[in-house]
Amino acid sequence: MSTEAHPTVQGCLVSFPTPHILLLTLNRPEKRNCISLATSAEIQRLWTWFDTQPALYVAIITGTGESFCAGADLKEWNDLNARGITNEMTAPGLAGLPRRRGSKPIIAAVNGYCLGGGFEMVANCDIVVASENATFGLPEVQRGIAAVAGSLPRLVRVLGKQRAAEIALSGLSFSASQLERWGLVNRVVEHDQLLATAVEIATAISRNSPDSVRVTMEGLHYGWEMASVEEASSALVDQWYAKLMAGENFHEGVRAFVEKRKPQWRPSKL
């Protein structure tokens, strides 16, 4: 793991369950882990730092207490409104996640209430593991707001228009098991197994070639962003395949397979 100090994040805990995994824990349980503007900017800086650290391969985000995240700090929003200040909704959004396009995967370990901006954050995470106690919702319409940070087109893509409409227009809450059936949640697990499951998945990813993970992330981004699957496939091959084949990890992976040994991966240089 890098010895470079990570950026500080107020109201959060930053730890490293293994040398290759970063764990960010939202730690304002008395406020349902809502995120202030200052904390949002600091978390965004943490993700930028994470993407530049060659020894860190995967990140996990979770929360303490009964909530994962209830979104933005609406008390702060109310104060801004009273002063005539508009809260700008610019990319990449709350905590740097709703419209993030990172080079490394982030796993959401949803431990409880996941509402508003918290749900918008999760909708763009690469893998979602949820506690059996978790609930999800977009109550923005009940507050005179709208979920414009990035989740709506993503939910339409993942769930279909009608399911996305039910979530976004009703403001109702939905169980983790419901969203697992609909395809947004990868796994629903017992509450006390949540973090262990997320770390297990992250560890499996971290054992793989960093170059392969990097190129695979680009392929996933292309599939997400482009209308044509053929255009996305061609873009991935044209822009990344030669780089992957020329890298040390490609040669090491094939050589290790032939020699029947565990590969010794190098930090990605792609």
Swiss-Prot record:
| Top-rank lineage group of the source organism | Eukaryota
Q: In which pathway does it act?
A: Siderophore biosynthesis
Q: What are the protein's UniProt keywords? A: Isomerase, Lyase, Peroxisome
Location(s) in or outside the cell: Peroxisome
Question: What are the recorded GO MF terms, alphabetically?
Answer: isomerase activity; lyase activity
Principal subcellular localization: other
The Gene Ontology CC terms held by the record are: mitochondrion; peroxisome
The top EC class is lyase
EC number(s)? Answer: 4.2.1.-
Gene3D superfamilies recorded for this chain? Answer: 2-enoyl-CoA Hydratase, Chain A, domain 1, Lyase 2-enoyl-coa Hydratase, Chain A, domain 2
Knockout: what is the outcome?
Blocks TAFC biosynthesis, decreases resistance to oxidative stress, and attenuates virulence in a murine model of invasive pulmonary aspergillosis.
Q: Does the keyword Nucleotide-binding apply?
A: no
Report motif location: PTS1-type peroxisomal targeting signal.
268-270
GO BP terms: cellular response to hydrogen peroxide; cellular response to iron ion starvation; ergosterol biosynthetic process; fatty acid beta-oxidation; N',N'',N'''-triacetylfusarinine C biosynthetic process
* Keyword Repressor set for record: no
Chain's role: Mevalonyl-coenzyme A hydratase; part of the siderophore biosynthetic pathway. Aspergillus fumigatus produces 4 types of siderophores, low-molecular-mass iron chelators, including excreted fusarinine C (FsC) and triacetylfusarinine C (TAFC) for iron uptake and intacellular ferricrocin (FC) for hyphal and hydroxyferricrocin (HFC) for conidial iron distribution and storage. TAFC consists of 3 N(2)-acetyl-N(5)-anhydromevalonyl-N(5)-hydroxyornithine residues cyclically linked by ester bonds; FC is a cyclic hexapeptide with the structure Gly-Ser-Gly-(N(5)-acetyl-N(5)-hydroxyornithine)x3.
The similarity comment for this entry is: Belongs to the enoyl-CoA hydratase/isomerase family.
Q: What is this protein called?
A: Mevalonyl-coenzyme A hydratase sidH
Which gene produces this protein? sidH
